[in-house]
Design a protein with these regions (language model features):
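Juxtamembrane transmembrane-helix termini in multi-pass membrane transport proteins
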Residues: 1-61, 121-142, 149
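Short loop/beta submotifs within extracellular cysteine-rich repeat domains
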Residues: 17-21, 84-86, 115-120, 130, ...
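Juxtamembrane/interfacial segments around transmembrane helices
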Residues: 93-100, 121-128, 157, 189-190
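Hydrophobic/aromatic residues within the transmembrane alpha-helices of Major Facilitator Superfamily
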Residues: 12, 16, 46-47, 81, ...
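Short hydrophobic "helix-edge" motifs at membrane interfaces and signal-peptide entry regions
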Residues: 7-9, 103-107, 152
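Membrane helix-loop-helix hairpins that form the core translocation module of multi-pass transporters
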Residues: 32-101, 149-172, 176-179
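Selected transmembrane alpha-helices and immediately adjacent juxtamembrane segments
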Residues: 94-119
Length: 190
């Protein structure tokens, strides 16, 4: 349960104000189809984070515990710096196609998550916890905890959130995770 909660919290902190949250907002305001958008986010996230977890678990099996600890610690510190860099929403409207809101969302979210900090965090968490199901479910839950309210409340919530403070809180959380990992803090397993 602890691994699940760490995975969920890590992704929630990284996803607040992220480009995929902005993408959810854009898709919702353009398509006005919340249920297919939410289902599309779920499918894309499951696929993307499963891929990331598989890669992370594979990489974790190749590294010694000491090298893995340092790699993960530095990765979390780099994520802390990365989260401070503002994401920019695309200025144009999403292309409309015959795929419908669901397929457009699946495709857009899967591609937007490629190389994103939450995907990299999912890889790092899988390398650490080595439980694919827990990592995939925890990271997906974290994404959905951020994206579902964004879709359901759309513009109202986004206008009132102080994005700078959210970014600072996420950077602080990633920094703490990085330092604790480097120091061998027990809940992270090192």
């Amino acid at each position: 349960m602890e691994a699940f909660l760490i995975c969920t919290a890590t992704i929630v902190l990284g996803e607040l104000g992220d480009r995929t949250q902005l993408l959810a907002l854009i898709l919702t305001t353009q398509l006005r189809r919340p249920l297919p958008i939410i289902l599309g986010i779920l499918v894309a996230t499951l696929a993307n984070h499963a891929l990331a977890a598989l890669l992370g678990q594979w990489a974790g099996s190749l590294l010694s515990p000491r090298v893995l600890r340092w790699t993960l610690g530095v990765s979390f510190l780099l994520l802390a710096a990365w989260v401070l860099v503002p994401d920019k929403a695309d200025s144009g409207a999403p292309a409309r196609s015959g795929y419908g809101a669901f397929m457009l969302t699946v495709t857009a979210f899967f591609l937007a998550e490629m190389g994103d900090k939450t995907q990299i965090a999912a890889m790092a968490l899988a390398a650490r916890f080595r439980s694919l199901a827990v990592v995939i479910l925890g990271t997906t839950c974290g994404m959905m905890l951020v994206e579902v309210p964004t879709v359901l409340l759309a513009g109202r919530v986004m206008r009132t959130l102080p994005l700078r403070w959210i970014r600072l809180a996420a950077a602080l959380a990633y920094s703490v995770l990085g330092v604790l990992t480097l120091l061998g803090f027990a809940p992270l397993g090192f």
